[in-house]
């Protein structure tokens, strides 16, 4: 039998493969660590007007960068802490990027904190200590500070208010102060002006709020004076209001009237941008506070009761009062990269 030879085709012994599929390599995205919040130590003497200023600046800084704010009540012994280079009140807190204080009793604690833990210091209002000791002094123009690289002049004091756009409401706000070093308080004079404002203004719905300085019984006296079924008057003591109450009321008001002694409340209303009328008082003397209020009248940013009573409508502020945001922008621009 003949030997049959099979021809072996070697190409069939190699397994057939399909061309390799090329899968594009997507670079792995590396998640960037979140920016660490900047630490603020806010020193407080417990006075509402001073807290309003420092909180206003903290609020404005939070609108620009991540912030962790720690409130530190001031206590005696700050001078000794400064001399010894220590600051026990902040021993459990992270190092500050910025320390803020308003009020004379916060000045030495600010310096003690910086010496012990570093960071920058910002003092609000003119300090008793030399201004050169602080990294930043935020001083109202009515204090007439001299020019210096670490001084930022503002139009009035800082506060927590934000601009209010016209709401079309028919509600008015009355803010009453009390006896002060700068003005002679007169219960009868203020009550008479309030009565005429409520009776002759086109506004029908009113809220009146007092302050710590308002004489006892004054608000109740106003309530008894005003009796008109076509009017609504709500009287609230300052004890019955919260931190954000004033901002809410200003946002709902078409106008506000403030006693002339209440400079902080005047600037809060101006910052909100609502028309502001002044319930007039007699100044004790011509000092920086009185001159500052007179400058607001002369610039037609506010109107005294005597001018309004002749038929002139309350004007909206002629300029924008946005000082907390302006100071915050300056701080972030100067120290934001540190």
Named regions from a protein language model:
Residues 199, 293-338:
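Leloir-type glycosyltransferase catalytic cores
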Residues 223, 227-264:
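Donor nucleotide-activated moiety binding/catalytic core segment of transferases
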Residues 131-188, 305, 309-317:
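A nucleotide-sugar donor-handling region in carbohydrate enzymes
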Residues 48-52, 79, 131, 145-146, ...:
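Short, charged/polar "capping" segments at the starts of alpha-helices
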Residues 41-43, 157-217, 237-238:
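Active-site donor-nucleotide binding/catalytic segment of nucleotide-sugar enzymes
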Residues 247-287:
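A donor-sugar binding/catalytic signature common to diverse glycosyltransferases
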Residues 42-156:
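Active-site and donor-binding regions of nucleotide-sugar-utilizing enzymes
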Residues 36-40:
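Extreme N-terminal starter segment of soluble prokaryotic enzymes
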């Amino acid at each position: 039998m003949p030997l049959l030879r099979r021809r072996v085709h070697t190409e069939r012994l190699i397994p057939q493969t399909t061309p390799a599929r090329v899968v594009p390599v997507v670079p792995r995205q590396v998640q960037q660590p979140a920016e660490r919040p900047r630490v603020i130590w806010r020193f407080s003497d417990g006075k509402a007007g001073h807290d309003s200023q420092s909180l206003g600046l903290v609020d404005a800084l939070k609108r620009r960068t991540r912030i962790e704010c720690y409130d530190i009540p001031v206590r005696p012994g700050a001078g000794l802490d400064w001399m010894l280079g220590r600051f026990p009140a902040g021993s459990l807190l992270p190092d500050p990027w910025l320390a803020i204080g308003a009020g004379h009793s916060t000045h030495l604690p600010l310096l003690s904190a910086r010496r012990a833990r570093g960071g920058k210091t910002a003092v609000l209002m003119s300090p008793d200590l030399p201004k050169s000791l602080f990294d930043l002094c935020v001083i109202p123009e009515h204090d007439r500070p001299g020019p210096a690289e670490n001084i930022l002049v503002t139009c009035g004091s800082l506060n927590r208010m934000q601009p209010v756009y016209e709401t079309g409401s028919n509600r008015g706000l009355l803010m009453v102060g009390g006896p002060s070093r700068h003005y002679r308080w007169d219960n009868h004079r203020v009550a008479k002006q309030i009565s005429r404002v409520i009776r002759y203004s086109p506004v029908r719905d009113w809220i009146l709020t007092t302050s710590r300085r308002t004489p006892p019984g004054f608000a109740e006296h106003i309530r008894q004076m005003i009796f008109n079924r076509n009017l609504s008057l709500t009287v609230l003591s300052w004890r019955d209001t919260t931190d954000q109450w004033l901002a809410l009321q200003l946002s709902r008001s078409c106008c506000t009237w403030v006693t002339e002694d209440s400079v902080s409340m005047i600037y809060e209303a101006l910052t909100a941008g609502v028309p502001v009328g002044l319930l007039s008082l007699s100044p004790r003397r011509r000092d920086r506070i009185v001159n500052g209020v007179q400058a607001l009248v002369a610039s037609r940013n506010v109107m005294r009761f005597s001018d309004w009573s002749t038929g002139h409508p309350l004007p909206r502020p002629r300029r924008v009062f946005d000082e907390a945001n302006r100071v915050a922008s300056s701080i972030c621009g100067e120290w934001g990269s540190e």
